[in-house]
Amino acid sequence: MQTIDEDLSRNLGRWHRIAHAAGLRLGGQALPQAIADQLRELQRGLTGERTRVATDYMDERGALRAYLLYYWTISLCETAAALAELRARRQLPEIRSVLDVGSGPGPAACAASLFGAERALLVDKSELALGAAKEIAAAGKQAGFSLEVSTERRDLEDFRPPEGSRFDLIVASRSINELWKDDPRKTERRRDFIRSILPALRDGGLLLLVEPSAHYTSIPLLELRESLRGEELNCAGPCPHLRACPMLAREGRPCFSEWEWHAPASIAELAEGAGLDRTSLKASWVAFIKGPQAAAMARPLLERDSGAAEGAA
């Protein structure tokens, strides 16, 4: 199990407190158990029966409050953990601008701010969630963060980036799995969606896709990775190569990372009240580097270091 370093954990805690306060303001004086009950209902709709997936649940104040008080911080930390892993491998490009697709109230963009991001375009179909994202970003600036956000309300299936726009990072956290979920051609349609937004990613920029670790979200993500092989992308993580996914070859086993995590007290309390296990972070994710310089960055570190040593000899 991997760990998150202390400095990053401290800043994640600052963002958590900001989002937590926004969630409390959204819902008035509801008792903790009432919020836990809302969380349990939301969790069942997203990861159990999945009846809430691809619906307008974030336009319901109660559901959005439960999300802000629980899932927001989890998405924040999962995205940050993946970015930290890429940084440790020396595969994280300079990040100043972010396109956050299916952003919800912005946890992924806030995570990117801890790795240099200064401005972000958030795209989501929920006006209420985008409003919460702007509120959180504004409070973040008052707390010393420097993230500027703009928003576009749009169904992702109809979204195309602004003409001429270029971003250092395109991130989709827990959103791609909701696209065309009942379509037999969902992998191809998700691939085509990624292709449609790639012109907005600069050469050398990072595409990061993060999903829950469950089998029904991990396997489709791995299948999407396979469908993107041979595009103008090179895989930077978790596997730093473009060979066929070894986990899919093992009868479709899920692939996910797990990080040690000491949940904030409010998260732990809600998890206990809702009957959820939250002793670590788990997420499936894939990261790609775009462009001609991507090939060198995407080679395994040992291979790159070996080549550098030979050149110095």
Predicted regions and their residues:
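N-terminal auxiliary segments of SAM/dcSAM-dependent transferases
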Residues: 1-53
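C-terminal lobe and adjacent flexible extensions of AdoMet/dcAdoMet transferase-like proteins
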Residues: 267-313
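A short SAM/SAH-binding and catalytic strip from SAM-dependent methyltransferases
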Residues: 168-187
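Conserved class I S-adenosyl-L-methionine
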Residues: 94-104
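A short glycine-rich, Lys/Arg-flanked "PGG" loop and its adjoining helix->strand segment in the class I
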Residues: 188-204
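Conserved SAM-binding loop of SAM-dependent methyltransferases across substrates and taxa
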Residues: 105-117
